[in-house]
UniProtKB/Swiss-Prot annotation:
Testis. Protamines substitute for histones in the chromatin of sperm during the haploid phase of spermatogenesis. They compact sperm DNA into a highly condensed, stable and inactive complex. Residues 1-34 are annotated as: Disordered. It comes from Perca flavescens (American yellow perch). One of its GO terms (molecular function) is DNA binding. GO terms for cellular component: nucleosome; nucleus. Keywords: Chromosome, Developmental protein, Differentiation, DNA condensation, DNA-binding, Nucleosome core, Nucleus, Spermatogenesis. This is Protamine. GO terms for biological process: cell differentiation; chromosome condensation; spermatogenesis. The lineage of its organism: Eukaryota, Metazoa, Chordata, Craniata, Vertebrata. It comes from the Eukaryota. It is found in: Nucleus; Chromosome.
Amino acid sequence: PRRRRHAARPVRRRRRTRRSSRVHRRRRAVRRRR
């Protein structure tokens, strides 16, 4: 039997996450530096 992932708790889909925003910030910094 296949296991279902995160079936127990419903999660709202969010486009932005802390991780993506952090990466964005890093890219901006690098751009400014160059």
